[in-house]
Design a protein with these regions (language model features):
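Alpha4 helix (beta4-alpha4-beta5 surface) of REC/receiver domains from two-component response regulators
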Residues: 62, 83-101, 112
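Active-site residues of response regulator receiver
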Residues: 8, 52
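Short hydrophobic/Thr-rich beta-strand motif most characteristic of the beta2 strand and flanking loop
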Residues: 25-32, 40
Length: 120
C-alpha cells in the first residue's frame, strides 16, 4: 500500500480520486491548493503526488518548482482541466512531473500510471 497526496481545488475531483485510489488499496491525503499540499508533503512525504495545475494561492506549477527544489526524487502526476493548454502540462513535465493528464481523464489510465510510477 502506498500513500498518495491529492492536490486539487475541486472537491469533487479530490473525492473521485480518493475513492478510486482507496479502492485500489492506497492511503490518501488531500489538500485544496498548492500551498496546503506542499506543507503536507513537508510534514509527511508521500510515495506519489497527484496535483492539479491551476489552483488558487499556489498553482501546481509553482508548487512543483518549490517541491523539486527541496525534494529531488518526489514523484508527481500533474492533471489539468484547461482544455487546449498543453503548455501548462508541458511546463509541469519540465518542472519534474513524470506524467500528465487532461481532465476529464480515464481512471483506468490514471491508475495504470499510478502503479507504474510507484513501481519505478
Amino acid at each position: 500500500m502506498a500513500t498518495i497526496l491529492i492536490i486539487d481545488d475541486e472537491e469533487g475531483i479530490r473525492a473521485l480520486l480518493r475513492t478510486t485510489l482507496e479502492a485500489a488499496g492506497h492511503e490518501v491525503m488531500e489538500a485544496a491548493n498548492g500551498r496546503q499540499g506542499l506543507a503536507l508533503y513537508r510534514l509527511r512525504p508521500t510515495d506519489l503526488i497527484i496535483t492539479d495545475i491551476l489552483m488558487p494561492e499556489l498553482t501546481g506549477l509553482d508548487m512543483l518548482l518549490d517541491l523539486t527544489r527541496e525534494f529531488l526524487h518526489a514523484k508527481v502526476i500533474a492533471i489539468s482541466g484547461v482544455g487546449g493548454e498543453n503548455h501548462a502540462l508541458d511546463s509541469a513535465k519540465l518542472l519534474g512531473a513524470r506524467r500528465t493528464f487532461h481532465k476529464p481523464f480515464s481512471m483506468t489510465q490514471l491508475l495504470d500510471a499510478v502503479q507504474y510510477e510507484l513501481a519505478h
